[in-house]
Amino acid sequence: MIVGGSDISKPSFYMKYKNFEKVGVEMENLWVFGFQALWSPIFLLFMISILISYFLIIGPYRTRFENATKVSKKQIFYFTTGIVLLYVVKGGPIDLIGHIIFSAHMFEMAVMYIAVPPLLLLGIPVWLYCYITSFKFVQIVIKFFAKPLIALFVFNGLFSFYHLPIVFDAVKQSQIAHPICLAILFFAAMMMWWPMLNPLPEYQTLSDIKKLGYMFANGILLTPACALIIFATAPLFATYTDSAAWMKAMELCVPAGTLSDLNITGPEFLHWMPVVQDQQTGGIIMKIVQEIVYGTIIGYVFFKWARREREKDKEQLQELPPYLQTK
């Protein structure tokens, strides 16, 4: 039915409902890839082993470390949340979906490199930092790669380079290059966050004001990569459009035997929006997650700095003669 030039035979809410219904049906199709591809049990065991080691170190083995004190519940929450998020995006279905839907891939990247590293760094107690940085090799690595300018340009440069179509497609289809590149990116992300969040006085290379500028610079440097994806008017990545490239990429997360038994020739069976729109959505997701996390950290640094300044003012006031102190 047409009224005033508009088709009201299928209201917009009905079409949205059908789209979500379609997503639900298509998500059920993921089970054809099997439990191993969906939940990565080996990676799950690895994450569990890290958590167990963490709780052993801060618990019964804490006395083996010099000047070790009880770890706060807030720190435990930060570290545990970081590990859980890392498994959810890298070991859970999101990783598999990210090989089929680009927006899921960008969500995975945003969480893994922007949200997880600060949580892990905030969850490590000072005395454990002291132990880790007591090794000469660690000191050399941190002093070079965690220099603010180097860390700033290395992470953002690698992230942008990784998402160049020719690089992205090559890495996504390589059993060797893919895990290596992801590991390098994660290391670069940890080094990028180090100047902001490490609690050791000897590694405080940025003042609080410079930390705010550092985060703003990070946001600016990540923008070109997001803009390239958001404003592209054609598909950029063959691994999401070309059947042969997609099948090759899927071998990275789906057992070869399972993949060969499936009657699937491309990612279209799970697409619930046009490829270009999915691509643009991915860029927007990355930018939104980045703004939320960076904004939160900027707020954290600002209020921490303001609180320290107030305490300093109180100390200076107490040093004045009584008749000069304001009541």
Each language-model region and where it sits:
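Serine residues within intrinsically disordered or low-complexity segments
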Residues: 6-12, 255-259
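Alpha-helical membrane segments of multi-pass proteins
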Residues: 23-327
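Hydrophobic residues within membrane-embedded alpha helices
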Residues: 3-6, 111
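Short, strongly hydrophobic alpha-helical membrane anchors
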Residues: 1-3, 10, 16-36
